């Protein structure tokens, strides 16, 4: 099935969770925020299974000065 991650199509297996997708794509475990279908997903819900066509946005915290 296909999901969109930060405006790029990604092919994933059925039953793929948010956490598994993030791991597969190499995102760090800390310092990120995730939204699925325009709703921010707390880390406690990252084991949620993605639906076909889901839109995932990942924002990485950047420290600056």
Feature map (PLM): residue ranges:
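Ubiquitin-like/PB1-type beta-grasp interaction modules and other compact soluble beta-rich domains
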Residues: 1-64
């Amino acid at each position: 099935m296909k999901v969109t991650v930060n405006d790029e199509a990604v092919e994933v297996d059925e039953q793929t969770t948010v956490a598994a997708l993030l791991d597969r794509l190499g995102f760090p475990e800390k310092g990120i925020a995730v939204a699925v279908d325009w709703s921010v997903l707390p880390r406690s819900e990252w084991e949620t299974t993605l639906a076909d066509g889901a839109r995932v946005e990942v924002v990485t915290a950047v420290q600056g000065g």
